[in-house]
UniProtKB/Swiss-Prot annotation:
It catalyses: N-terminal L-lysyl-[protein] + L-leucyl-tRNA(Leu) = N-terminal L-leucyl-L-lysyl-[protein] + tRNA(Leu) + H(+); N-terminal L-arginyl-[protein] + L-leucyl-tRNA(Leu) = N-terminal L-leucyl-L-arginyl-[protein] + tRNA(Leu) + H(+); L-phenylalanyl-tRNA(Phe) + an N-terminal L-alpha-aminoacyl-[protein] = an N-terminal L-phenylalanyl-L-alpha-aminoacyl-[protein] + tRNA(Phe). Functions in the N-end rule pathway of protein degradation where it conjugates Leu, Phe and, less efficiently, Met from aminoacyl-tRNAs to the N-termini of proteins containing an N-terminal arginine or lysine. This is Leucyl/phenylalanyl-tRNA--protein transferase. It comes from Pseudomonas fluorescens (strain ATCC BAA-477 / NRRL B-23932 / Pf-5). GO terms for molecular function: leucyl-tRNA--protein transferase activity. It is an enzyme of class 2 (transferase). Keywords: Acyltransferase, Cytoplasm, Transferase. GO terms for cellular component: cytoplasm. Its main location: cytoplasm. It comes from the Bacteria. It is found in: Cytoplasm. Belongs to the L/F-transferase family. NCBIfam families: aat (TIGR00667). Its EC number is 2.3.2.6.
């Protein structure tokens, strides 16, 4: 039975209560307050829902992740990185990045990043949890991504690209920076061909929970401001 969250508590059900079909649906309801979102990521779940649906919280099994040491850089991407074809900044314009991620895609109907979601993650950014990566081409924003950093873990949320390999360029740059900062895992949530091409793979929900247990509260060397 699906658990409905109450507004007067931030508690989530145990991850093992998540449904098998649809894979990982853990709870519904609640709100998108900053405190609830922080608790959700610490617990191992994330919000994902379409317009007209209640807020839905997910913890899929298996979980798609990328270990920084396993980043795969294709020949074409490596060439762009070596030439520093694009310029990358961090936390320069979070609002522009999440707005671009929310824009309709040619291959999808609508967007799950509603205005309410944008406001919620902007609050997380203002509190120092959510961060953006901007990819520029001669001063024009052509790609980027955003997510949350907690301890030695980064929780990726969404990315966009307006130029060839721009989002991959930003992601690869971020991964190398996270590696230098002592991060051990990047949560990619759901599998996609795009992520797998970069080296992402699946681990079990218990494995993912173990990383949360051991790395959420450890310090990192992150310095986000560019």
């Amino acid at each position: 039975m699906l658990t409905w969250l109450q507004r007067n508590t931030l508690d989530f059900p145990p991850l093992e209560k998540a449904m098998r079909e649809p894979n990982g649906l853990l709870a519904a309801g609640g709100d998108l307050s900053a405190d609830r979102l922080i608790q959700a990521y610490r617990h191992g779940c994330f919000p994902w829902f379409s317009e007209g649906q209640p807020i839905l919280w997910w913890s899929p099994d298996p979980r798609t992740v990328l270990f920084p040491d396993e980043l795969h850089v294709s020949r074409s991407l490596g060439k762009l990185l070596r030439k520093q074809h694009y310029q990358v900044t961090f936390d320069r314009d979070f609002a522009a990045v999440i707005s671009a991620c929310a824009a309709p895609r040619a291959y999808a109907d609508g967007t799950w990043i509603s205005e309410a979601m944008q406001r919620a993650y902007l609050q997380l950014h203002q509190r120092g949890y959510a961060h953006s990566v901007e990819v520029w081409d001669q001063g024009v924003l052509v790609g980027g991504l955003y997510g949350l950093a907690m301890g030695q873990l980064f929780f990726g949320e969404s990315m966009f690209s307006r130029a060839d390999n721009a989002s991959k360029f930003g992601f690869a740059t971020l991964v190398e920076r996270l590696k230098a900062w002592g991060f051990v895992l990047i949560d990619c949530q759901m599998p996609t061909e795009h992520l797998h091409s970069l080296g992402a793979r699946s681990i079990s929900r218990p494995e993912f929970a173990n990383y949360l247990k051991h790395h959420l509260d450890l310090p990192s060397r992150a310095i986000w401001v560019s």
